[in-house]
């Protein structure tokens, strides 16, 4: 259970509650920012993973209210904000986070996850205890978990490019806290889950007559705000630079914000069959233009297969992506230079750049029923009958739970067009970032607050092979010592 941060470790317990933490020092590198953090005056303890981008503003506001601080960390701001504003303190947070706050006197525990679910939080319950962790394998390491495959989760996994929507996971005995959710665990063991935020995809009438230039200006300003908010680390921050529009824009905005000598990183592979394996000529142009400290990382074919086990082991949940191993190797190399990097990923999720969005804009997708049909045809890996052909009778289900899930989501108010319904579903459910990089605590999603979601590369590594998802699931189960066939 060692992974997560490599810089420090801490344990705290009181009564029936215990917290453990491994730290990656990003803000306030001193021991004053260590976790679990206890504020004896307030009677609170916290253990969390993430970064609060507006913690300095909140710290000033809390200081004006009379609070005194013993550290310079965002962790302490989290504690005092909870003390001042209660559960709804999360409304004031801009950032990515998964936290557990314990009240000393009452024994109440509050768990919370950020709006877009950038930081994961898993739960497992038994008759006598509730355990939570930032990774699913951490719960498995503690034992006493029902590791049978959840048939409904398996149906989603085989329909949605290996995504299992919360609160389910692929295992029956483990759930995940949904994005923008709070879970209150009362002293008597009762639990209550509430959603504290939902994105609104309703078209704004006051922007109906905006020109393209108006939208360009608004997007650029929002990007500037997003980049500025993320410049809070007390360690050097780098940037992934592919040479494409998205990452090049981020590098330019970081330079505009005053970042000099920015470390940038580009990845390249061996050329195969006359096809060039890198785009260094494009990234070099941007690196030279903004005078970055540029690193070209070349990855040959030899380390790819040996790294497969490590990449799968780093996944909190089985995740099929054509670039998982590459990003795992990239994170190892980048971590030799910096602890945090920005990236330009996320634009396709905001501006509907994926291939399944154009059909959602057609007249046939205007109604909820039409939207479901178009989304199913463009996005689903296979229909329910196709899922049934892959699994054993023990996992066959009546009906179509994946189709029903999408139908119910599309039918909710707040998104009037097919594109908006798909964007809302993708932003809040379908899009998760690369698990291997996330496990290393390296990548900081460079996304517009409340708009951009984490990226998800979903191209199958075994094109044309109906068993690619099953194979990955089997490898993940074996890697985490879960016995029994997946299907």
Regions found by a protein language model. Name each.
Residues 1-315, 327, 393, 471-479, ...:
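Cysteine-centered catalytic environments shared across enzyme families
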Residues 76, 152, 221, 281, ...:
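A structural signal for well-ordered alpha-helical segments within the folded catalytic domains
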Residues 86, 161, 316-318, 451-462:
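Short loop/turn hinge sites at secondary-structure boundaries
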Residues 351-377:
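A mobile, often basic/glycine-rich helix-loop segment
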């Amino acid at each position: 259970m060692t992974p997560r941060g490599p810089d420090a470790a801490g344990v705290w317990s009181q009564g029936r509650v215990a917290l453990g933490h491994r730290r990656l020092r990003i803000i306030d590198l001193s021991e004053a920012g260590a976790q679990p953090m206890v504020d004896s005056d307030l009677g609170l303890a916290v253990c969390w993973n993430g970064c609060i981008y507006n913690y300095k503003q909140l710290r000033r506001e809390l200081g004006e209210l009379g609070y005194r601080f013993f550290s310079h960390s965002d962790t302490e701001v989290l504690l005092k904000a909870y003390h001042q504003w209660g559960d709804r303190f999360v409304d004031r947070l801009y950032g990515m986070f998964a936290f557990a706050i314990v009240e000393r006197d009452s024994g109440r525990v509050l768990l919370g996850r950020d709006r877009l679910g950038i930081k994961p939080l898993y739960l497992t319950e038994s008759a006598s205890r509730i355990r939570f962790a930032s990774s699913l394998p951490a719960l498995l390491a503690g034992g006493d978990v029902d590791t049978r495959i959840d048939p409904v989760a398996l149906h989603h996994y085989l329909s949605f490019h290996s995504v299992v929507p919360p609160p389910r996971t692929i295992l029956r005995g483990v759930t995940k806290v949904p994005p923008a959710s709070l879970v209150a665990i009362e002293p008597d063991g009762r639990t209550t889950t509430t959603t504290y935020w939902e994105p609104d995809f309703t078209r704004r009438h006051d922007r109906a007559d905006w020109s393209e230039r108006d939208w360009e200006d608004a997007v650029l300003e929002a990007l500037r705000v997003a980049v500025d908010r993320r410049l809070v680390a007390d360690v050097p921050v780098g940037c992934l630079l592919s040479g494409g529009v998205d990452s090049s824009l981020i590098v330019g905005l970081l330079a505009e914000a005053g970042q000099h000598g920015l470390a940038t990183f580009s990845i390249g592979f061996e050329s195969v069959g006359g096809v060039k394996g890198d785009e260094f000529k494009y990234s070099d142009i941007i690196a030279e233009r903004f005078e970055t400290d540029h690193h070209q990382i070349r990855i040959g074919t030899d380390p790819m297969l040996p790294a497969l086990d490590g990449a799968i082991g780093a996944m909190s949940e089985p995740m099929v992506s054509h670039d998982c191993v590459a990003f795992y190797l990239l994170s190892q190399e980048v971590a030799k230079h910096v602890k945090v990097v920005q990236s330009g990923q996320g634009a396709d999720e905001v501006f509907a750049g994926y291939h399944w969005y154009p059909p959602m804009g057609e007249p046939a997708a205007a109604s909820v029923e039409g939207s479901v049909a178009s989304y199913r045809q463009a996005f689903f890996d296979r229909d329910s009958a196709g899922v049934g052909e892959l699994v054993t009778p023990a996992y066959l289900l009546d009906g179509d739970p994946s189709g029903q899930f999408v139908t119910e989501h599309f039918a909710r108010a707040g998104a009037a067009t097919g594109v908006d319904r798909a964007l809302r579903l993708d932003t809040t459910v379908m899009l998760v970032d690369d698990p291997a990089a996330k496990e290393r605590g390296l990548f900081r999603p460079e996304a517009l607050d409340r708009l951009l979601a984490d990226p998800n590369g979903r191209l199958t590594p075994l094109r044309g092979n109906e068993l690619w998802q099953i194979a990955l699931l089997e490898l993940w189960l074996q890697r985490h010592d879960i016995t029994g066939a997946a299907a």
